[in-house]
Structures are given as structure tokens and as C-alpha cells.
């Protein structure tokens, strides 16, 4: 056992590390939003809602059909004119999840393990990345963690209904945050009757009650999620649009979208079958930011190693703890497999398993530390303590190294100190920003811009932007008999200006069009577009 004085010193050390980590994330966040999803969705759609005076359908933005519980919160900082605050709103959900982990581990192990669990969670690279950007994933992490922990408490407290209600409400909030919450709903709806029936295996009445509790959980969760379902059904005839649209609207079936995730990876990255099948393990070791081939994010490899040690010495654990470890482990494994088979893997898609894996990892470390036999000498105990200490230090070192890399990449001090202005900072990461700012300052309020290969990043535009639809634009060019007809078709959609990303547009046109289409497109660009401004590989044109 650790001496009380040593434990107090370790507690203080971990608290200092926690405060340093939180301060670092706060500094990293204090720059203008430049992440892709923020500019296409999480800030762009709330801004449009604010300008419109309420929620309305935006057919050109597929993201606008997603559930938006957290996105609606971002309307508050946008209304106040400070979009940086949206990052701190998102970070709050990470802090709340860290508190949940701390509270659970404090009750199950001790204060020292609880502090380490919170520190480990908040410093994991993908959590840091999400904390300093405007996403919604940390909201999903928080609500799914609340849901599963209160499900465990429901069993612990003799199945008092209030804990099941809290779990179901949290699952409903998770659904309203991101569609990945559907996996949480499916798994926990199955877990509810399973957990209850394990206590009353020989009673027919209890089996009916187990089914009742599962149905009750499902009903409460879907009730909270229902406003988003109803909205989408009214607009698109598909409550989960754009998911499963081939079921609800078979006429809209896209052959490309029907390609499975395994085939996609084979086509895009030339991966072998073994490489693809090993993705559930590879994500813990090979993750890279901004690289879809390597899952667009980073985890800590120990999250897939240490949880297995949580099962060591199970016979000495209370039956309640054994059950909770199994449930947390089952949730993490099943969620990971569902995400793996359903779509091309991104680490952001599996964030709900991170809190359970952190809890299991801390249990694993605790088991390694406490593992002992009577014949073990004092020297072996010291070796075991040294091993745990080395593991803890190495885990935190991996996370700390990532945070240092973020300071280099984000460069917050240059902006905070005033050496770099807001527009200059944004333009460094989003080269189309200069063209968008020119349009904001020089185009009339009723201008309508077609954005072509600007990545749908329209948040910083104060003019209406209609985003480029590849299939529709190609169909328009294919059906045009002349450059004049192409101009007519574009103006007929109310388009007055175009913003074009040159490199991607040229590559796309050369690959997709034949001689006739290229001639029409060339005449259109030469005779019916007037270049107003160009910078950073992007140009603003006026239709003439």
C-alpha cells in the first residue's frame, strides 16, 4: 500500500497536471474556428438559422438534416458575436465527462485512481483535438457516458426506476447530438433486459418485466429524439435523413453510396483484406490527424491493452464490480464493431467508447498494482509498483507529446499576442478566406454565390452561398448545348457569382468531361465570367 503522505503528494501532483492540461486546452482554443466541420456545419448552420430567425430547411446543406442539440447551443456565442466561445461550450462536455469518470473511479477504487482516470481521459489526443475545435462529439461522449453509468447504477440500486429514466433521457440527448447515438441506443436497449434478467433468471414474470424495462428505455429515448425525426420526415420523407435514404426514398439511390466501407478502403487506399480486418486494433496504434486513411485522429495504444487486465483476479472482486466491468467491456467492443462494419472508420465515430476504455484501463492498472501472492517477496512488490509507475508515465508522455504538437500546429500565442490578426490567422489554414472576405465587403446583400470546390466551408461568408453539387453541375454541363445555355441555366437558379477552387476544379473537369463539354466549359469561363478577385488558389467571378 502507498503511504498516506506519498498518496497525498501524488494527488497534488495529478491535480497540478490536470490544471496545467485544462489551461493548455483553454489557450489552444482561443483562436478563430478553422476546422472543416465547424465551417461547413456546426457553426455554419446555426449562423443561417440566426440570420433567418429560426430553423428552416436548407436543401443544399446535407448537414442541416443532422440532429443538432449541441449545434443549437452554439447559437448563443454566435448571437453574442464571439464564435470562439463555442469551443469552450464544447470543451465543457469533456470536463463533465472527466468528472463522471472521477466520481465513478473514486467510489470503486480510490481518489488517486480517480484523478488519474480524469487526467488520462482529458489528455487523450482525440479528446484534446475535439476540445479545441467546434464539434459535437464531446456532447455525444458525455451523454452516452451518463447513460451507461446510470444504467449500472440502476442495477446497483436495486432497479430503482429513476436511474433508468436518467439513463434513457441521456441516451435521448445523445441521439439528438449525433446519429452515432443510434448505436448507443441499440446496445443499451439490449443491455437493459439482459441486466435485469440476470438477477431473476428463473422467474417468468421477471422476463416480462425485463422486456418492459427495455421497451420503456427505448420509448423514453426516442421520445426525446422525436423532434428531429419528425422534422426530417416532414422535409424528406426519411426521419433519419440522409441515413438509410435508399430505404425511405428508393428513387434517390446512389450507386456510389451503396459501396460498403471495406470496398471503399480497397478502392481508395489499396488496402489488403488483412489490413482492413485489423482496423479495430490499428486505430489505437496508427491514428493520424487530418488523414482519412489513418482514421483522422489519434488514440492512446494503452486503451486497447490495459482493459484486459481489469479481468485479472476477478474472483476477489465483488459480484457487482465484476458485472460492471463486463458491461463496460461489452459496450466498448460491440460499439467498435458496429462502427467498423457500418462505415469507413474515423476515430471520431467511436468516441463513446473512450470513457469506458479509460475506466477499464484504470481498473487494469489497479489490478496490476494490487496483484500479489503470499510467496511474493518485497522486491517483487517494488518491481510491480515500478512497472505501474512506468506505464502511467509513458501513457501521459504520449498524450503530452501530442499536446506539444498542437501548440506548434495551432500556434495560439501568435494570435493571442496580436502579432497575427483574425483574418490573417484564418487565411493561414483556409486559403479561400481572402476571397470570401472580398465578397463580403464588395458584393451586394442580394448576391448569390455558387461555391465550387471550396469544401462547403461557408461559415465566414456573409452572402448566400449555394454549395457545389457534383452530380447536378455535371448534369447541367452535359445537357448544355452552348456556353450561353450554361450561363442561362446557372442564372436561372439565381446564381450571380461563383467562387472556384482552381486546382480541384481543373482536375475534376479534365477527368470527367470530353472534348465537347470542355469546349463549352472553356467558352463559359472565358466569355461569361469576369474575375473580380483571386488569391490562394481561389477566384471570385461575376456571371456576365
Language-model regions: role of each:
Residues 7-19, 112, 162-170, 185-190, ...:
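Signature aromatic-anchored transmembrane alpha helix within multi-pass, membrane-resident enzymes
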Residues 18-19, 115-121, 166-171, 187-188, ...:
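Transmembrane alpha-helix segments characteristic
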Residues 30-44, 388, 394-438, 455-457, ...:
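Membrane-proximal, lumen/periplasm-facing interface regions of secretory-pathway glyco-
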Residues 47, 137-140, 174-179, 183, ...:
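Hydrophobic/aromatic-rich transmembrane helices and adjacent perimembrane loops
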Residues 84-85, 101-125, 142, 156-162, ...:
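Transmembrane-helix signature of polytopic, membrane-embedded enzymes
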Residues 94-98, 198, 279-322, 333:
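Hydrophobic, aromatic-rich transmembrane alpha-helices
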Residues 106-107, 147-163, 198-201:
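Membrane-interface transmembrane helices that cradle and orient dolichyl/undecaprenyl
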Amino acid at each position: 500500500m502507498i503511504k498516506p503522505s506519498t498518496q497525498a503528494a501524488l494527488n497534488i501532483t495529478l491535480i497540478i497536471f490536470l490544471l496545467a492540461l485544462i489551461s493548455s486546452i483553454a489557450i489552444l482554443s482561443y483562436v478563430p474556428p478553422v476546422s472543416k466541420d465547424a465551417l461547413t456545419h456546426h457553426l455554419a448552420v446555426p449562423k443561417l438559422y440566426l440570420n433567418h430567425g429560426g430553423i428552416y430547411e436548407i436543401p443544399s446543406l446535407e448537414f442541416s438534416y443532422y440532429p443538432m442539440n449541441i449545434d443549437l447551443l452554439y447559437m448563443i456565442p454566435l448571437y453574442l458575436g464571439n464564435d470562439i466561445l463555442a469551443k469552450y461550450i464544447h470543451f465543457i462536455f469533456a470536463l463533465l465527462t472527466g468528472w463522471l469518470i472521477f466520481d465513478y473511479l473514486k467510489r470503486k477504487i480510490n481518489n488517486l485512481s480517480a484523478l488519474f482516470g480524469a487526467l488520462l481521459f482529458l489528455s487523450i489526443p482525440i479528446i484534446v483535438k475535439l476540445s479545441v475545435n467546434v464539434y459535437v462529439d464531446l456532447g455525444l461522449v458525455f451523454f452516452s457516458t451518463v447513460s451507461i453509468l446510470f444504467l449500472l447504477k440502476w442495477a446497483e440500486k436495486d432497479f430503482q426506476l429513476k436511474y433508468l429514466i436518467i439513463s434513457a433521457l441521456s441516451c435521448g440527448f445523445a441521439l439528438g447530438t449525433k446519429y452515432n447515438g443510434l448505436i448507443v441506443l441499440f446496445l443499451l436497449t439490449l443491455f437493459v433486459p439482459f441486466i435485469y434478467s440476470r438477477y431473476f433468471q428463473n422467474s417468468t414474470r421477471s422476463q416480462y418485466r425485463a422486456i418492459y424495462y427495455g421497451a420503456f428505455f427505448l420509448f423514453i429515448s426516442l421520445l426525446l429524439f422525436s423532434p428531429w425525426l419528425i422534422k426530417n420526415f416532414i422535409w424528406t420523407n426519411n426521419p433519419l435523413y440522409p441515413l438509410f435514404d435508399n430505404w425511405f426514398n428508393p428513387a434517390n439511390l446512389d450507386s456510389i453510396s451503396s459501396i460498403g466501407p471495406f470496398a471503399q478502403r480497397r478502392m481508395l487506399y489499396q488496402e489488403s483484406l488483412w489490413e482492413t480486418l485489423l482496423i479495430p486494433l490499428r486505430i489505437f496504434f496508427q491514428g493520424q490527424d487530418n488523414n482519412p486513411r489513418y482514421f483522422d485522429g489519434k488514440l492512446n495504444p494503452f486503451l486497447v491493452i490495459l482493459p484486459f487486465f481489469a479481468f485479472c483476479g476477478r474472483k476477489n472482486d465483488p459480484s457487482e464490480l465484476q458485472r460492471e466491468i463486463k458491461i463496460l467491456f461489452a459496450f466498448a467492443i460491440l460499439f467498435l464493431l458496429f462502427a467498423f462494419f457500418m462505415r469507413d472508420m474515423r476515430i471520431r465515430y467511436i468516441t463513446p467508447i473512450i470513457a469506458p476504455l479509460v475506466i477499464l484501463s484504470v481498473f487494469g492498472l489497479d489490478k496490476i498494482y494490487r496483484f500479489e501472492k503470499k510467496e511474493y517477496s518485497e522486491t517483487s512488490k517494488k518491481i510491480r509498483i515500478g512497472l505501474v509507475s512506468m506505464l502511467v508515465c509513458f501513457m501521459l508522455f504520449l498524450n503530452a507529446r501530442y499536446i506539444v504538437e498542437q501548440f506548434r500546429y495551432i500556434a495560439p500565442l501568435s494570435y493571442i499576442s496580436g502579432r497575427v490578426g483574425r483574418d490573417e490567422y484564418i487565411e493561414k489554414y483556409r486559403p479561400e478566406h481572402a476571397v470570401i472576405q472580398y465578397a463580403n465587403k464588395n458584393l451586394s446583400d442580394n448576391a448569390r454565390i455558387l461555391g465550387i470546390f471550396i469544401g462547403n466551408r461557408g461559415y465566414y461568408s456573409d452572402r448566400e452561398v449555394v454549395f457545389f453539387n457534383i452530380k447536378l453541375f455535371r448534369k447541367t454541363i452535359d445537357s448544355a448545348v452552348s456556353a450561353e445555355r450554361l450561363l442561362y441555366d446557372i442564372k436561372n437558379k439565381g446564381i450571380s457569382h461563383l467562387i472556384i477552387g482552381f486546382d480541384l476544379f481543373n482536375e475534376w473537369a479534365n477527368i470527367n468531361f470530353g472534348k465537347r463539354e470542355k469546349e463549352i466549359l472553356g467558352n463559359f469561363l472565358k466569355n461569361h465570367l469576369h474575375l473580380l478577385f483571386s488569391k490562394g488558389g481561389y477566384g471570385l467571378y461575376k456571371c456576365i
